[in-house]
């Protein structure tokens, strides 16, 4: 759960000072909204028996879960809140794509719709015994469910809302890099809960996931910083922080199944891939993805998912594939799971944004955008002179 304040600080520091509180408010309130929806029906639709795409309402309001009920070796209430944290951070990641121009009410409407019709079915398909799980997809801690899912939704939102006023003409620099660093550090700490905790036991897989997360993140920081140094002539703190996030994202689907050497390679590749995503791909897409959600979470999530299919091989130090599965087959399954997630999330996001637009409108008026969302949407200023 520390990832929630972490992402609020990380994104907040990347924005202009007139919009930092709007970002933090969007993250905090969407977190609360998703928590409530998770208890009402989210956990049930994701993790109860159902069909290939959705669970059922059998555990709505946690019906049938007793104080002593178990999920694996843990009490089931722990599983409920642990998985709630994944749902909350996934929705929080999305809002960075269209920051500084969206209506607060539109964020909440979108979040409720997208959570229900994209996050929950993807989580069920991958982790709840659904379609992709039956196909053999490997996603240890959320490459598809969290990162690709969120990144595609954010990209759709960035396109539909359009570019910020003055984009390409004015300098949009991060207003507080120490805040970005603090957010990165908190995210880094919280990520160990995601990755090691996804082993669902204090065992050798949790230890492997913990170590792999450290190694991959270190590799990604180095590859991003040195690549940036070569391209721009100077290494930057923002590059180091972005490399850290890129490494965390890339190792997420692989943390508990690849060896340490594989984790290092995934991190090194993820760092360079993330830099490519925010420098070149962003220009090719001609999109104003404010906090580079797709460039980091989308690109590195895809890279991590594909390389999971490679480095899970026992011959490369991983835990090995299911009986009879070859590397080529597993990579194909991974690519298919990526494709399903991209299409599903993209379609749901498009519809959800359109509905929010019809109900309240997506974008604030230009004069409010130029003055800042903090004062116009929330009646506050982050920095009072």
Predicted regions and their residues:
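Glycine- and aromatic-enriched membrane alpha-helices
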Residues: 1-385
């Amino acid at each position: 759960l520390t990832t929630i304040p972490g992402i609020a600080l990380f994104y907040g520091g990347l924005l202009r000072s007139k919009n930092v509180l709007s970002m933090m408010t969007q993250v905090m309130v969407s977190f609360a909204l998703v928590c409530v929806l998770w208890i009402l029906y989210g956990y049930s639709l994701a993790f109860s028996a159902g069909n290939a795409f959705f669970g059922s309402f059998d555990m709505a309001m946690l019906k049938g879960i007793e104080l002593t009920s178990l999920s694996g070796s843990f009490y089931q209430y722990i599983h409920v809140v642990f998985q709630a944290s994944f749902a909350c951070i996934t929705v929080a990641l999305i809002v960075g794509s269209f920051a500084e121009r969206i209506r607060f009410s539109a964020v909440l409407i979108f979040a409720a719709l997208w959570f229900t019709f994209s996050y929950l079915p993807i989580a069920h398909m991958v982790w709840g015994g659904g379609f992709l799980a039956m196909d053999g997809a490997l996603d240890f801690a959320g490459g598809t469910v969290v990162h690709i899912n969120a990144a595609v939704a954010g990209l759709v939102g960035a396109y539909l809302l359009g570019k910020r006023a003055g984009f390409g003409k004015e300098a949009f620099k991060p207003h507080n890099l120490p805040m970005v660093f603090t957010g990165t550090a908190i995210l880094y700490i919280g990520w160990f809960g995601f990755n090691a905790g996804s082993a669902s036991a204090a065992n050798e897989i949790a230890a492997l996931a913990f170590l792999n997360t450290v190694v991959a993140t270190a590799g990604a920081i180095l590859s991003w910083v040195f690549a940036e140094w070569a391209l721009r002539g100077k290494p930057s703190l923002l590059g180091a922080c972005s490399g850290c996030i890129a490494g965390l994202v890339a190792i997420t689907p692989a943390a508990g199944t690849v060896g340490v050497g594989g984790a290092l390679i995934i991190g090194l590749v993820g760092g360079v891939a993330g830099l490519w995503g925010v420098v070149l791909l962003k220009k090719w897409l001609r999109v104003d993805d404010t906090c580079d959600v797709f460039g980091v979470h989308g690109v590195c999530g895809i890279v991590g998912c594909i390389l999971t299919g490679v480095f899970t091989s026992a011959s490369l130090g991983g835990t090995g594939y299911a009986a009879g599965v070859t590397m080529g087959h597993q990579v194909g399954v991974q690519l298919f799971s990526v494709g399903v997630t991209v299409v599903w999330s993209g379609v749901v996001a498009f519809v959800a944004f359109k509905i929010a637009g019809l109900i309240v409108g997506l974008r604030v008026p230009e004069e409010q955008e130029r003055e800042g969302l903090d004062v116009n949407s929330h009646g506050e200023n982050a920095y009072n002179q």
